[in-house]
Amino acid sequence: MFLLPLADAQSKTVAALSDDIVFKASPVQEEAEQYLSRYLMQYHFRRVAVNDSLSQEILARFLEQLDETKSYFLASQVEQFNKETGKSIDDQFLAGKADAGFRIYNTFLSQAKKKMRFMIDLLDTARFNFTARDTFDLKRKDALWPSNSAEQQERWMREAKYQLLTLKYSGEEEDDEPRKVLKKRYENRLSLLEKQTADDAFRAYNYALTTSFDPHTSYFSPRDYEDFQIDMSRSLEGIGAKLQSENEYTVVNEIIPGGPAFKSDLLKKGDRIVGVGQNAGGEIIDVVGWRITDVVRLIRGKKGSTVRLKILPVSQANKGPSRIIRIVRDEVTLEEQSAKKEVIDHNGKKIGVITVPAFYLDFEGQKNNRPDYKSTSRDVGKILTELKKEGVDGVILDLRNNGGGALEEAVKLTGLFIPEGPVVQVKNARDGVVVLRDEDADVVYDGPLAVLVNRYSASASEILAAAIQDYGRGVIIGGRTFGKGTVQSILKINRPFNFFYKNNDDLGQVKLTVAKFYRISGESTQHLGVTPDIIFPSFIDSKVVGEDTYTSSLRSDVISPVRNSEPTRLTVDSINALRKRYNERLKTDSLYARYVSDLNTLKSFRDKEVISLYEPDFKADTDRIQGFEAQWNKEDEPDLLLKESAGIVADIADLSKKSLIVGGEAAPWQTRRK
């Protein structure tokens, strides 16, 4: 997906560009491209064969990020791109050239502006018929490119009808008439397109080039890197979320643990923000087509004030209907990110719940040997000691929505539950493998344990969950994890022998994938993630969230296991016994039955490839989705997964007392992972 740039001071003074403007790479950009190609070839974990296949991959990725829904380019234009550049991008890559990218981007700009003007005129003049049995194709990714302008414009007209119906039945606080709102969106988008520069073309092409190696590799121009360090961190003030632009939309890229958005549990990674309103009754301003800096300016505000966000939820594959959420602005502090505990009752058994939003570490405090410095492992260790004193029958470690953090803390936290031993393996691009171990033989807690995960549990969370699973130390419950099992490093692009150069312009930075994580079993968490022992259905759409949704993600592979002689507590038979009890409970759980029914309704909506533009049918679908989403987003709605997990931990405690959960001398992965 194409990431539109953060605005800079210069963009405000750029005059509207005519469609015949042709962008070309500057000398500094050409030089940066030369070094970028060398860095990718020399340092990236993936060894890429530079040939015509790479040319095709980069071209396909570039066309997809510019025009994923096949809305701008015609088939004849794509054919010309393939003829001109389909077998030469690899040669340009080795030569450090970006000519192909600039040519394609120039055509994209012309076509995109053409569409925006068409849509604006259409909304001014057309009379739309919503009683006809028309349909709109939602999944255009695998469709053919339009063969001519007439076919293209027919699709544009259907798109306008779909957008108008979506706005009409968005459900809440739509002050303006849908046609007016939609026209303004296209005007905003056109304005943004007319302010594009050669820097934007260079950025877009290099995004396609670098993400062809893997989705976490990227190039930062000097301005981009400043935005990466400063502007995006400033955007945390207010709601605690990182945002990025994808075409005309502002998209949530990350939810910061402990922040207002995290605590509200209403905003998710991948949600599109289409409107922003202030306080309880302020106007919802449509922000589709806005520059991201302007959107951030609306979202930020005084601590304690309320911001209302109109979103297209990722849970509905961003198709709509939209939903309005309310978040109270606040600061994000380390204290808010800290692990927290509660004790819940399950049929007379006390179950301790430890919520870990992130793997945090006060590096400065650790470096200076402060006795009270904060870290995940230290905080959780204290909580476990408290829970033991309170006499809990079992513990749940909740890692849902935990995107990772300090690797050191994942290793130390695992060590609270196991004797000393290997936790994770790290392999670099030269096939060197380092084993990270828990060096502390003490076990803080050795009782019944469950680890909760979901699709947003990533990186360090997956390392801990995998280790607990491979040791047979606890049961993993929830949904398959994200699958982020790689390590990135940011390198500054430097000229060799820089003192020979008169031009000392900054060439930017490159973020490279340089290593992969592997379980002690030898399997990689990359791409596949961690599959729970007991799977719980989820509202999260695994088709749009997760490492395996990226076509260029590094695949999972296997290296040698790390042998260890520690016995496993939970064998295959133990897990099967827990599953049996769990499934028996679900048969009589009416809340779970309603949950599954609503999930099936949502899944059928997500999987729709074609949607009706016949207004009564469209409204009926929208009402049904809004109804169950409103139910499950109530603040007082029970945490169903936590409730079921408490039952499973209680089962572990019960089976342990009956000596039905026993250890074994074989390596855990030989016992558990058959």
Describe each PLM feature range:
Residues 65, 87, 101, 106-117, ...:
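PDZ/PDZ-like domain segments forming the peptide/carboxylate-binding groove
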Residues 25-68, 75:
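N-terminal-proximal low-complexity accessory segments that begin disordered
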Residues 460, 472, 477-545:
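Polar, glycine-rich mid-to-C-terminal structural blocks
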Residues 122, 172-184, 516-673:
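Conserved functional hotspot residues or short segments at active or partner-binding sites
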Residues 13-21, 33-45, 84-88, 184-188, ...:
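Acidic/histidine-rich, surface-exposed loop or edge segments in extracytoplasmic proteins
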Residues 9-11, 15, 180, 196:
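Boundary at the C-terminal end of the N-terminal hydrophobic targeting segment
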Residues 24-25, 38-51, 191-198, 217-236, ...:
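Cleft-lining beta-strand/loop regions that shape enzyme active-site pockets
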Residues 50-56, 63-138, 190-245, 306-308, ...:
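Extended, small/polar residue-biased N-terminal targeting/export presequences
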